[in-house]
From Swiss-Prot:
Belongs to the LptD family. The gene is lptD. This is LPS-assembly protein LptD. HAMAP family: LPS_assembly_LptD. The lineage of its organism: Bacteria, Pseudomonadati, Pseudomonadota, Gammaproteobacteria, Thiotrichales. Keywords: Cell outer membrane, Membrane, Signal.
């Protein structure tokens, strides 16, 4: 037996150091189970006395409050009233950090003796410190290896605490039996905490969530595989003072290899009251994707009734997974949804499908699916997408108001293969469309490209910096099947002309660029050749079977930069003034003998003034003899590069009338001015674009076109946005477009219809009223149709360890008339409900409420806890 004060037994073998202290208790607060010294200065001198020994959480005589306090102390919970959760878990590593460098073991106690077999029996504030590991207890039996160079195993008893600062693991138990060689151990009755990685969003930050799972077990065992096995225990994510919910189980297994926790034969408890039996439950203990049930969902929709969804996530392999979701609809029956995702070295993609084996209302099987994949190998890229739906009402009946689906009239079917490098951009595209609603007329059905081949070349790198030679080649075969000739009921089948189009465009451009300005003239000569396959059933007839068009495009783009730096109390800034001229000349050519395959007219906006062609696609090239003059100004913060304000204003002066329009063949628009009432104006509208940081967190943007001759504003788009550090969001957007060219369908163009005005307003917000309560809302109103297009309101209650949210939505289904996609249909109500236990989020879960909130500008997935 070792006796005497300040006696040390020093055993130094290799890199392991044991320091044994006899009858000497350190004054150190790190050991949570020993009597600490409390010291204060009295009359200029230290006055110390022993503090009372902390109460044991296992003491059956403790009151509920005393037990919570004891547990908080044992798990190193530090109170911080300014935090919503009231504190945080401490993971102080100051006592083991140095041991990671020295690779030594620090062993201390008050009394000790050796058995004949060399076993060390220690008592009184036993403390074992190693790199990133702390063990404390009242008594310990320590077995050393054969040469006494390291600890082989130990048994600790009394008030035992085990800590691992790097992982945040803390175990409070009555006894510990540990094998130091293989890292296995077992305990008696134990309380514990485990760290849980969470998204960096408001309800999961350190002020609103502890970031840990904690629990209790009759026995706590770590096996040689690394798995942790608990018996007769529970888990929760509440702090030591929060017992809002628990998941209990006779057996709780934590697989450290798959990072999953499995609970068997347990209950879901609220305030210690069992409310639901759980025969089996699994959840991840980190952010990695793991198989298991995800949160069930609740939705109510007028078209399908009440739906309850139960999703299950399969983590099949590191590079592919599967999500299955069973939905029980009160009016439709069972619906099975599945999403399979995969990723290889060169490809990634997913399959999304839904199937209703038997629809109670329709009396038949219904479904839809989407298959998409992309690939990349060095400079080669591929893309494939195929969509299918069983009938025209499927999206309306089962999308629960999803605006991406209830507005869908076409199904994408596309394959792309491209090769690109610094000098070549080439590709092959095969594109076709499926029709959701068979009433879609043949004119309004887009052309298929069977196929389209492109080859673009540039001389960059081969010619001087001031010279660029390029060529653009695009060869396409356009094909369209027969469809309704018009919108009348029982309309006969009609066709559109099919054709081959060859587009070649060589270009020479000069680039005279300096730090203070630039002058970039260019000459381009698009050559178009069409081979038409006319048919008597074509809704638009063309006189010729072949058409050739050659048009030169001459352009000069010039500008200068004037910079000025200045400094104020807020920082250093650069103000830039950028005057710009853009001249374009294109001779006139009658192009009404060319069909419209992929062409429409753009709305006039500021950036459109710096394009040589106001038409999209390649079937129309406007005539032009025009000059754009513009002035741009901006202020930039030099420290972070953010733009505080930018303003742009410009106008085009026309030296010739715009004669090219969208008339084609024998369509009903023979008057060249019918499609564009401003084609003879000398000046374009004055076009402006503004972006301005009004003050911190408040941003204003606007685009306004003012026609001087008519003295009216015919294009105005405004957006006012606010978002602060607490993720409070408020947006107001207003659109008023006098002539909305982009809304015209191909049939309306063929009939010579004038573009209709568009006027809408959208208000949206997410407000975290308190740490508990948050609201989200959106309201979109169409002034022309005097109807709400979309509206929803959501409510979230956020507690320390759980959250609940609900949302009501009313959406106008716009796909009721596929030939008039801007026409709002009837409003349909949808209700959604979600419940979440913090820390038990199902990886891969897709939140229906989150998909609605993404319509709010500034919202990021996860701000309401969705998608965890």
């Amino acid at each position: 037996m070792l006796k005497g004060i300040h006696k040390y037994l020093l055993m130094c073998f290799g890199t392991v150091l044991f320091t044994v202290q006899a009858n000497a208790a350190r004054i150190m607060s790190n050991n949570p189970i020993k009597e600490d010294w409390q010291c204060k200065v009295v009359d200029g001198e230290w006055s110390c006395k022993r503090a009372k020994k902390p109460k044991s959480v296992f003491d059956k005589k403790l009151t509920k409050t005393e037990k919570e306090k004891a547990l908080a102390d044992d798990l190193a919970w530090v109170k911080k009233p300014s935090y919503f959760v009231g504190g945080y878990y401490s993971n102080d590593s100051q006592f083991t950090k140095a041991l990671c460098e020295s690779k030594k073991t620090d062993l201390s106690y008050e009394k000790s003796e050796f058995d004949n077999d060399g076993t060390l029996i220690a008592s009184g504030n036993v403390q074992v410190l190693q790199c990133d590991q702390e063990l404390y207890g009242n008594n310990a039996i320590i077995n050393l290896n054969s040469n006494n160079s390291a600890i082989r195993s130990l048994v600790m008893a009394g008030d035992v605490i085990v800590k691992q600062p790097s992982t945040g693991i803390v175990i409070r138990t009555t006894e510990l039996d540990a094998d130091m060689n293989d890292g296995t151990y077992s305990t008696g009755e134990a309380y514990f905490r485990l760290a849980r990685e969470m998204p960096k969003t408001r309800i999961y930050d350190k002020e609103h969530f502890s970031g840990y799972l904690r629990g209790y077990a009759k026995t706590f065992k770590k096996e040689s595989s690394g798995d942790i096995v608990l018996s007769d225990g529970y888990i929760t994510s509440g702090d030591p003072y929060d017992n809002a919910w628990k998941i209990t189980g006779n057996n709780i297994d934590i697989d450290t290899n798959t990072h999953m926790a499995y609970v068997k034969n347990g209950y879901f408890e609220i305030q210690d009251i069992p409310v639901m039996y759980i025969p089996y439950f699994s959840h991840p203990i980190d952010d990695r994707r793991r198989s298991g049930f995800l949160y069930p969902g609740f939705v109510q929709n007028a078209n399908s009734g009440i739906g309850i969804s139960v999703p299950y996530y399969f983590n099949l392999a590191p590079n592919y997974d599967l999500m299955l979701q069973s939905v029980i609809w009160s009016q439709r029956g069972i619906m099975e949804n599945g999403t399979f995702r995969y990723m290889t070295k060169y490809f990634q993609g997913q399959f999304e499908g839904s199937l209703v084996p038997y629809d109670f209302k329709e009396g038949k099987m219904r479904g839809s699916f989407t298959l998409s994949t992309t690939g990349q190998y060095e400079n080669i890229n591929t893309n494939f997408k195929y969509e299918y739906v069983s009938d025209q009402n499927y999206y309306n009946d089962f999308s629960a108001g999803n605006v991406n689906l209830v507005t869908k009239t076409l199904l994408d079917r596309e394959f792309d293969l491209t090769y690109t490098n610094d000098y070549v951009d080439s590709g092959l595209t095969v594109l076709d469309y499926g029709v959701v609603n068979p009433l879609l007329t043949v004119d309004n059905t887009p052309y298929a490209k069977l196929p389209e081949v492109k080859l673009n070349l540039t001389s960059d790198g081969y010619t001087p910096d001031y010279l660029t030679l390029s060529a653009q080649t695009l060869n396409t075969f356009f094909y369209k099947t027969a469809g309704p000739a018009n919108t009348n009921p029982g309309a006969p089948q009609g066709t559109n002309v099919n054709a081959f189009r060859a587009y070649e465009s060589p270009k020479i451009a000069f680039n005279f660029n300096k730090t203070w300005g630039y002058l970039n003239p260019s000459l381009e000569v698009p050559i178009r050749y069409y081979q038409l396959k006319n048919s008597p059933t074509d809704t638009i007839q063309f006189a010729n079977s072949s058409v050739t068009s050659v048009l030169p495009i001459f352009n000069i783009d010039a500008g200068a930069y004037f910079d000025k730096d200045y400094t104020n109390e807020n920082g250093t800034y650069t103000s830039t003034l950028h005057p710009r001229l853009f001249y374009t000349y294109i001779p006139y050519q009658d192009q009404t003998n060319i069909p419209l395959f992929d062409t429409s007219l753009q709305n006039e906006q500021y950036m459109q003034m710096f394009q040589v062609n106001r038409f999209t696609g390649y079937d129309r090239i406007n005539n032009a003899n025009q000059l754009t003059y513009a002035l741009e100004a901006s202020t930039t913060n030099q420290e972070d590069g953010t733009t505080l304000a930018s303003a742009k204003i410009g106008q085009m002066a026309y030296f010739a009338d715009r004669k090219v329009n969208l008339c084609q063949g024998n369509s009903a628009c023979p008057n060249p001015g019918l499609m564009d009432p401003f084609s003879t104006d000398t000046f374009s509208p004055i076009m402006t674009s503004f972006e301005f940081q009004v003050m911190k967190n408040i941003y204003l943007s606007a685009q306004v076109n003012y026609r001087v001759k008519q003295q009216n504003v015919d294009y105005q788009v405004y957006q006012l946005s606010y978002k602060d550090e607490n993720e409070n969001i408020f947006n107001v957007s207003y659109n008023n477009i006098a002539n909305n060219w982009s809304s015209l369908t191909q049939q309306q163009i063929a009939e010579g219809a004038k573009p209709q005005p568009q006027e809408t307003i959208t208000l949206s917000t997410i407000l975290n009223i308190t740490d508990h309560w948050g609201i989200a809302a959106l309201w979109n109103y169409n002034f022309q149709q005097k109807q709400i297009a979309n509206i929803f309101a959501g409510l979230q209650y956020n507690a320390k360890s759980w959250a609940v949210r609900a949302l009501w939505q009313k959406t106008a289904y716009t796909n009721q008339d596929p030939n008039n996609p801007t026409l709002l249909g009837p409003l349909v109500n949808t209700y959604m409900f979600e419940f979440e236990l913090k820390g038990l989020g199902g990886i891969g879960n897709t939140s229906d409420i989150s998909s609605r909130l993404q319509q709010i500008n500034g919202y990021q997935v996860g701000e309401w806890g969705d998608g965890i």
